């Protein structure tokens, strides 16, 4: 009888351990859905292989400490002179293309996420769009201020759009609280 109880106790302990090990995944807030140019974009987990286009979007990612999840940046040296601080934050993250990335540039890095905008890494009718990348299971967060290039009813660039994109990026990567604190700090500096 004691052997039977011991086996059942062991099974119960293993079952409880399995249940509790799943709690961090639930507590992290996934799945999450954000708006990307009027389209819902859902993540069941934070991206692990992100590519970010343009210096400003890269700086947003760096501010959230996303470097460990980044496999590339694009559109830096072809348009800008990177500061020593930017280069330090970029670290060993390679630049995949100095200006606009090609589909081949991106696929070679095997990303699961691309943060770019219309006329900021993507061109209407080009090879790199949310639709073309979606065929390769690459989710694209479109910079909100660029949505006006594909939908004239969308709002023009504003600080609120920038704040919203930072909050979306934080939510996607499981860093919503950190993003909220950054946005609050930005708002205080601008006020």
State the predicted function of each range.
Residues 2-4, 16, 20-60, 171-191:
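Bacterial Sec-exported substrate-binding components of ABC uptake systems
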Residues 52-109, 113-121:
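A short, structured surface patch at a secondary-structure boundary
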């Amino acid at each position: 009888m004691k052997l039977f109880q011991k086996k059942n106790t062991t099974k119960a302990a293993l079952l409880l351990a399995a249940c509790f090990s799943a709690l961090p995944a639930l507590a992290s807030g996934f799945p999450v859905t954000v708006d990307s140019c009027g389209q819902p974009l859902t993540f069941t987990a934070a991206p692990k292989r992100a590519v970010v286009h343009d210096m400003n979007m890269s700086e947003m990612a760096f501010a959230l400490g996303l470097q460990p999840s980044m496999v590339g940046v694009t559109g830096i040296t072809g348009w800008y002179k990177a500061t020593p601080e930017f280069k330090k934050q970029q670290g060993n993250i390679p630049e995949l293309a100095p200006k606009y990335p090609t589909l081949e540039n991106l696929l070679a890095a095997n990303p699961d996420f691309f943060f770019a905008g219309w006329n900021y890494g993507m061109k209407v009718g080009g090879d790199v769009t949310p639709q073309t990348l979606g065929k390769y299971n690459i989710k694209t967060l479109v910079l909100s201020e660029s949505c006006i290039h594909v939908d004239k009813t969308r709002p023009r660039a504003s600080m609120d759009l920038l704040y919203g994109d930072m909050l979306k990026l934080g939510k996607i990567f499981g860093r919503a609280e950190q993003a909220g604190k950054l946005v609050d700090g930005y708002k205080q500096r601008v006020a």
